[in-house]
Regions:
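C-terminal catalytic domain of Rieske-type non-heme iron oxygenases
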Residues: 2-176
């Protein structure tokens, strides 16, 4: 994922143990074999966003969908609040939401490669997890992203976004 995780608290836990519940949850979507297919996009694979908010608000916003109808009415038209479900991981590790309405983008007759072991009955599922305290991850049948938050002040945050796709053709090909 091109991210280094550091625990600065005295409650040290091995990262493999920390991430295991999320790995188990997502094993229904992607297995270890599929994880080997993830490729970072070279052209638009990394970018920053400056946000006028406290970083904790950005995490909260990412974890829930109740704000969609009022804050994101256009998004709510294609991904209605009723199509979302809540995800609660182990306390103080991760939480988020899932959707049952993901549609793969298609350009002409081409689309990004999909994870080969993703269950066919779950092709429209996507999940959005906040890995506490400041990492957010999105998992889709055809791409994966990670972004981490850098608090700049009490009301300013920089979001660092990393994009990954399945195979080099999707990540860096000319067609998409």
């Amino acid at each position: 994922m091109d991210i280094v995780f550091i625990n600065i608290n005295s409650n040290e836990i091995d990262f493999d143990d920390y991430i295991k519940p999320l790995e188990q949850r997502w094993s229904k979507f992607i297995n270890k074999e599929d994880q080997e297919l993830i490729v970072h996009s070279n052209d638009h694979g990394y970018f920053n966003l400056s946000v006028d908010c406290n970083w904790k608000f950005a995490i909260e916003n990412y974890c829930e969908s109740y704000h969609l109808p009022t804050i994101h009415p256009e998004l709510n038209k294609v991904s209605n609040i009723n199509d979302h479900y809540h995800i609660q991981g182990l306390p103080n590790r991760f939480a988020g939401q899932g959707s049952k309405k993901y549609e793969q983008p298609i350009k002409g007759n081409k689309k990004f490669n999909s994870f080969p072991n993703w269950e066919k009955c779950m092709l429209k599922n996507s999940e959005y997890i906040a890995l506490f305290p400041n990492v957010m991850i999105g998992l889709h049948v055809d791409h994966f992203y990670v972004f981490w938050l850098e608090p700049l002040s009490v009301n300013k945050t920089k979001e660092h976004m990393q994009m990954y796709y399945i195979g080099n053709d999707s990540a860096n090909g000319e067609d998409l």
